[in-house]
Amino acid sequence: MREILHVQGGQCGNQIGSKFWEVVCDEHGIDPTGRYIGSSDLQLERVNVYYNEASCGRFVPRAVLMDLEPGTMDSVRTGPYGQIFRPDNFVFGQSGAGNNWAKGHYTEGAELIDAVLDVVRKEAENCDCLQGFQVCHSLGGGTGSGMGTLLISKIREEYPDRMMLTFSVFPSPKVSDTVVEPYNATLSVHQLVENADECMVLDNEALYDICFRTLKLTTPSFGDLNHLISATMSGVTCCLRFPGQLNSDLRKLAVNLIPFPRLHFFMVGFAPLTSRGSQQYRALTVPELTQQMWDAKNMMCAADPRHGRYLTASAMFRGKMSTKEADEQMINVQNKNSSYFVEWIPNNVKSSVCDIPPRGLSMASTFVGNSTSIQEMFRRVSEQFTAMFRRKAFLHWYTGEGMDEMEFTEAESNMNDLVSGYQQIPGRYR
């Protein structure tokens, strides 16, 4: 079957990843020890997309966990589903990357990378027909960004024809964890443009806003944010794991969403998002899902789709519904908001329908869009990068690890090329 190999790196990646496995285990009826306790054959039919069946009948995630310090790994291991992972698949160093991209990419990370690649190879050999890799990481720190992109480029060398999907958490506009985020993010984007096939762009601030405004949580925790991300991650691959009327997979998604190879950074959203108190007062209908799914407030990254235009988009519906209704709603959206879609790609919204809804919902939908407005985010990071780089602030941390200023200049111009790539997209006869 079409297996997906999951890799999580750094603190952020491991926290998102462990939440994701909680969601997927729940959907497939697998308990924290790896035993199947579900009630429907559909849960087992394609369970091997994400799981390996061990000899004793236990299901083991096809997951590789890496970090440059043991802390987060220990908390994953002691967490609710910590015992389900294969112990050999935890690969960690002791030193940490200290939020330094160069440490993750060139020094500390480079020492650990072969151990990670061995585990990846072992997992890939266990697959019948590996479809691709999904990587969870953040771009603001050191390990997820530096070592994450190093791993992506190594996997790209070894498996050039497999899909590479990333869930990348970008630095937020107002909330900054570390002062060198713009450096780390720019150096990472430089790599992702070249080596990844599809990047789902996430950002903590947008996720905070969704939790605060829509879900009415007064003090959202990272756990709440990661829950949103994992719902989306599960939605992107649900068609591979459950039978559906209209299937999509990672490659179909890429073919339908990427008109130009470099422009593969997508905005994602999920519906229905309702606060816990108001759930019972809302009917779940396809029009309602569609409306929320296309709502700008629902996007999980800090860019406003109303400031740009959609090149392409994909809507993945889950639950019992008529495909005709789903298609009609999509056509409806395009007709009503035609100025927000480029007119030189006709029918640029792809929809797919999977019969099994997420736990506790009768229907749901996941949105993935390729919008030119995502340049706002790259522009913002780029401006912060330039402000510091002009003064050569904090550079010694990177050059001390053997990096060259030239590399910063290259990354900066690659980011600017990406932004102008989005800006040059012709609008409506202007």
Curated annotation (Swiss-Prot):
InterPro entries: Beta-tubulin_BS (IPR013838), Beta_tubulin (IPR002453), Tub_FtsZ_C (IPR008280), Tubulin (IPR000217), Tubulin/FtsZ-like_C (IPR037103), Tubulin/FtsZ_2-layer-sand-dom (IPR018316), Tubulin/FtsZ_GTPase_sf (IPR036525), Tubulin_C (IPR023123)
Location of the protein in the cell: Cytoplasm, Cytoskeleton
GO terms of molecular function: GTP binding; GTPase activity; metal ion binding; structural constituent of cytoskeleton
GO biological process, one term: response to brassinosteroid
GO cellular component, one term: cytoplasm
Listed Pfam families: Tubulin, Tubulin_C
Residues the record lists as binding Mg(2+): 69
Alphabetic keyword roster: Cytoplasm, Cytoskeleton, GTP-binding, Magnesium, Metal-binding, Microtubule, Nucleotide-binding
Binding-site positions, GTP: 11, 69, 138, 142-144, 204, 226
Main location: cytoplasm
Disulfide topology: none
Needed cofactors: Mg(2+)
Family: Belongs to the tubulin family.
Subunit relationships: Dimer of alpha and beta chains. A typical microtubule is a hollow water-filled tube with an outer diameter of 25 nm and an inner diameter of 15 nM. Alpha-beta heterodimers associate head-to-tail to form protofilaments running lengthwise along the microtubule wall with the beta-tubulin subunit facing the microtubule plus end conferring a structural polarity. Microtubules usually have 13 protofilaments but different protofilament numbers can be found in some organisms and specialized cells.
Role this protein plays: Tubulin is the major constituent of microtubules, a cylinder consisting of laterally associated linear protofilaments composed of alpha- and beta-tubulin heterodimers. Microtubules grow by the addition of GTP-tubulin dimers to the microtubule end, where a stabilizing cap forms. Below the cap, tubulin dimers are in GDP-bound state, owing to GTPase activity of alpha-tubulin.
Protein name according to UniProt: Tubulin beta-3 chain
